[in-house]
Regions:
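Intrinsic low-complexity/IDR segments
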Residues: 1-82, 86-87, 91-92, 96-102, ...
């Protein structure tokens, strides 16, 4: 670990500013430097090399760290509130206990980063790479996690209250004991995720089944530009993942209506298996129905509870 004087740091930052403005200078190389006793508030360190730097407890509030190399950096308990970390490389970085409230981490690489007990409330993590990261007991309340890669991530005991996980990939993530009250999970991939003792409420979007859990009900599916009206039977297995698309193992065909002409048909073939035919009055069934509800596109008769959703489906 290297040590530098305040004067040397000032010179490095001035040269970096010139480099950023294409006025000469050079890109700041602060790799493996102990920066704990230095002031970097409001500094522009975008594109700088801080690989392996010691930034523990440092105040980086509102600092520009866009595209910065922070691989293996030690940022434990650092103040990164409202910091610009868009596209930053934080692979294997230690951010345990760091304050990242309102930080912009859009498309940042946080693969295998340690974020235990970090405060990421209101942070923007859209499309960030958090594969294999440790976010145990972290605060992600109100965070933007849309399209974020959370596969194999540890989110146990994390607070995701009001977080937006739309289309996030949480494949094989640990979400045990996580608080998902008011969270949006629409389109999120939860296949293989550990959801034991997860906390939800009626306002958690995408977690509860999109279809009735018990009893018979009407469902709709699209096939060959027709809407097939189905009666999902009382004893039919049924499931949904995190969208409004559902699956069942058997259903009775009630009506088949052409979407464009409103004319009735007696039978129609499946768009995905031409040998699977829906005939009015008959019960169609699947022998190899997949009981894993989070495997949304697996085997089963796919349908929607809303007729309009079926019409809109492509």
């Amino acid at each position: 670990m290297r040590n530098i004087s305040p004067e040397e740091l000032k010179r490095i930052l001035e040269n970096h500013e010139l480099w950023l403005n294409r006025e000469g200078g050079e890109c700041a190389d602060l790799s493996s430097v102990d920066l704990r006793d230095h002031i970097l508030v409001y500094a522009n360190l975008s594109y700088a090399n801080l690989k392996g730097a010691d930034l523990r407890y440092i105040n980086l509030n509102d600092t520009n760290l866009r595209h910065t190399n922070l691989i293996d950096a030690d940022l434990r308990y650092a103040d990164l509130e409202e910091a610009n970390l868009k596209y930053a490389d934080l692979r294997n970085a230690n951010l345990g206990g760091a304050d990242l409230r309102y930080a912009d981490l859009k498309e940042a690489n946080l693969k295998y980063a340690d974020l235990r007990r970090a405060d990421l409330s209101y942070a923007n993590l859209k499309s960030a790479d958090l594969r294999g990261a440790n976010l145990k007991e972290s605060d992600l309340s109100n965070a933007n996690l849309t399209y974020t890669d959370l596969s194999n991530t540890n989110l146990s005991y994390a607070s995701l209250v009001n977080a937006n996980l739309t289309n996030a990939d949480s494949n094989n993530a640990k979400l045990n004991h996580a608080n998902l009250k008011h969270a949006i999970l629409r389109g999120a991939n939860l296949r293989g995720a550990d959801l034991s003792d997860v906390i939800t409420n009626i306002y958690t979007i995408g977690y509860n089944l999109a279809c009735p859990e018990k009893g018979s009900f009407i469902g709709y599916k699209k096939a060959d530009n027709c809407i097939v009206e189905l009666l999902i039977l009382e004893d039919s297995k049924r499931s949904s993942a995190t969208s409004v698309k559902c699956r069942c193992d058997k259903a009775k065909v009630l009506h088949i209506i052409n979407i464009e002409t409103d004319s009735y048909k007696e039978e129609v073939r499946s768009d995905y298996d031409e040998n699977f035919v829906y005939r009015v009055g008959e019960i169609v069934s699947i022998d190899d129905y997949d009981n894993d509800r989070w495997n949304e596109c697996s085997t089963g008769i796919h349908f929607f509870v809303s007729k309009q959703d079926a019409i809109n489906y492509k």
